[in-house]
């Protein structure tokens, strides 16, 4: 069903957004130059974006040819994966019915149909950030219940998806995940500060006796 939502008529409209045109051109130049390590425009270094999304477009163009469909196909795949991810997370948080409703509401919105039928970086970046934050939450929830092995797995997955997000759009990923982590730990930090202040105002009785 997700494939029917995002794949048909994917190449029916010319690339029109500045980012769509540039990223597709970067992928085309990678194929022409056989230089898969450096992103370039006009065969000159293009330092604005990391290469992960461009690599996806290269693979797509090698499979489907250099055209609009191939430039946008990676994001259609991203749309399918996104629906599967939110269904499974919804199912884990509540139940299968909640996961299904989450998918229906999300797929019924306008923005996903614009994003997943485009050739821009943001859909993959958003998905990778979302998954990274999910594993961060898993790592820091019920810390006394989950085993050390599972904690290590969650930490490794959190780090891996954060790294993939950085490879997709750069250090912006660190800022977003760092902000989320800061907000998550802020209550704990404030509680510690309050406890320390109370201890300073009200020293233990045994210290008062010996003054």
Label every model-predicted segment.
Residues 1-197, 202-211:
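Membrane-integral, polyisoprenol-dependent glycosyltransferases
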